[in-house]
Amino acid sequence: MKYFNVGKIVNTQGLRGEVRVLSVTDFADERFKKGSQLALFDKKDHFAMTVEIASHRKHKNFDIVKFKGLYHINDVEKYRDFTLKVTEDHLADLEDGEFYYHEIIGLDVYENDILIGQVKEILQPGANDVWVVKRKGKKDLLLPYIPSVILKVDVPNGRIDVTVLEGLDDEN
């Protein structure tokens, strides 16, 4: 079974068993809603247990989560630095033109039907995501996720068609 990160427990919150979660999901309200089931993985990325969400609220830059059956700080302290994950069958449905990062990373990138590399990472520096393309014998290419650059994404065929605008490739 495949699991995908939704957040990391970075600390406890108060004495009543709440934890601070640094979320890495665009669907925090859905992932952390009461009754949701998440997998808890330890610091070495080994499955530890399944937890059920008892409550969720936002506080500053964190999601404050309480798990069913864990009602005291002593019950949750040991889970600091553990990761919360969701199974693939619980991923939210996306709109047309939206993708999960795991679907994009590893795809081949083409310009004018010439293979230029593979997506190795996706950065979120601001208004637009930036796709990092690993190229053989050249520096990585940074492509903003905008319509004038990313022309077509074909996940089933493992292909992305792009136009590298002037100034994006400093090796030309």
From Swiss-Prot:
GO CC terms of this entry: cytoplasm; ribosome
Subcellular location: Cytoplasm
GO process annotations (BP): ribosomal small subunit biogenesis; rRNA processing
Transmembrane segments: none
The PRC barrel domain, residue ranges: 96-168
Predominant location: cytoplasm
InterPro entries referenced in this protein's UniProt entry, alphabetically: PRC-brl_dom (IPR027275), PRC_barrel-like_sf (IPR011033), RimM (IPR011961), RimM_N (IPR002676), RimM_N_sf (IPR036976), Transl_B-barrel_sf (IPR009000)
The UniProt record lists the keyword Cytoplasm: yes
Domain of life: Bacteria
Alphabetized UniProt keyword annotations: Chaperone, Cytoplasm, Ribosome biogenesis, rRNA processing
GO molecular function terms attached to this record: ribosome binding
Similarity field: Belongs to the RimM family.
Subunit relationships: Binds ribosomal protein uS19.
Function recorded in the entry: An accessory protein needed during the final step in the assembly of 30S ribosomal subunit, possibly for assembly of the head region. Essential for efficient processing of 16S rRNA. May be needed both before and after RbfA during the maturation of 16S rRNA. It has affinity for free ribosomal 30S subunits but not for 70S ribosomes.
Domain notes: The PRC barrel domain binds ribosomal protein uS19.
Protein name: Ribosome maturation factor RimM
Recorded name of the encoding gene: rimM
